[in-house]
Amino acid sequence: MVDCGVDIYQLPVVPRACRSPRGRRLKIMRKQRSEFEVLAQVAGRFSGERKNRIVIGSLAHETKETKDDNVVVNNFLETMEVEVKPQPGLENLSQVLLSKDWLALGPSMPNSPITQEENFDSRSKIDSKRKVSHLKERGSCISQESQNMYPLKKRKLFYQNHSSESHDTPCTVKFGIKSLNISELLVDVPESATVGSLKLAVLEAVTQILKGGLNIGVLFQGKTIVDDSKTLLQIGIPYDDDDDENLGSLGFMLEPQKSETTTITTFTTVSPRTRLRQNQVLGSVDSTEAVAAKSVVPVRMKPAWQPEMVQRRIRRPFTVSEVEALVQAVERLGTGRWRDVKSHAFNHVNHRTYVDLKDKWKTLVHTAKISARQRRGEPVPQDLLDRVLAAHAFWSDRTG
């Protein structure tokens, strides 16, 4: 425990696991209950003795003895102190002394009130002041001790939460536009034109679009945002969004002003016409009509080695004649010479590679080993499957 009242060297705090406050509450409640039970027993005992003495005094008319007994009891009660701890929520803590009127409790004197003794003893006043000051000092240390009882990780989170609440910094959203792309730009130049004249022609075409003035429109998830007073958070772009889906769905449009129309100057054309398609340009330029709205959306650049159009191979199952030709070639050349099998049996078949032939042979061996009910795909005659097993066993023994 850390003594908050004395300024001495304090040992380093060792992180502990959080303790449940339920056990401490039960201990406090039991202690308070036991103190109140002792107080009630003392009050009942003295009230019973008082009743007996009142009855005896009324019968024997011995007023002198009863007065002496009262003096003794009152002196005993004045010197007895009972410390009562308040319930949770009460702030004023003090000591309560049993009054003389406690002897009057009972059915014989119901109207007598319970009053607090006003004339405190000097010793009781000093003790009560010390105890109250000690309790106040202990109350000031409760917050520090409760923080020390947290584990180290929870304590760090505790300080981070308080620091984040105290310093409210504005959150920002970062956007990066790598390139402004137009879908397609058609430029007609003669074959004898130089690279410099080609650059000049493209520059004039783009300048003709931009010189008339542009308006910027915002697109989010394919919808145009008309209200300029909306915030990014209202649109649906939070600042702490780690996913790039929202940022990728945000686009900008370059729109020419409605009051002006731009036209493109006609370049000198010589047949054959050369059509240049730029990869970094999306949109079209018309020589006679008004310029339409151009959408500006960041596009990921493809690597130089990756082709623009990758044709997907069409899966073509092997026919029975192709399977028979494959079996004949393997029987003659073996299972380890697939390039020779390709050049010997499938030389004029461009859609069959030697890897396809190797995979098909493995499939035929597996199909021949399983039962007819488990086979799938185009059925293969059983005599061909028998030849596959025989050739596979022959070349396996020879190569092994």
From Swiss-Prot:
GO terms for cellular component: nucleus. Homodimer. Expressed ubiquitously. Disulfide bonds: none annotated. Residues 310-369 form the HTH myb-type domain. Residues 338-365 bind DNA. This is Telomere repeat-binding protein 6. It comes from Arabidopsis thaliana. Its main location: nucleus. Binds specifically to the plant telomeric double-stranded DNA sequences. At least 4 repeats of telomeric sequences are required for binding. The keyword Acetylation does not apply. Keywords: DNA-binding, Nucleus, Transcription, Transcription regulation. PANTHER family: TELOMERE REPEAT-BINDING PROTEIN 2-RELATED (PTHR21717:SF70), TELOMERIC REPEAT BINDING PROTEIN (PTHR21717). Residues 173-252 form the Ubiquitin-like domain. One of its GO terms (molecular function) is telomeric DNA binding. Disruption phenotype: No visible phenotype, probably due to redundancy. It is found in: Nucleus. InterPro entries: Homeodomain-like_sf, Myb_dom, SANT/Myb, TRP_plant, Ubiquitin-like_domsf.
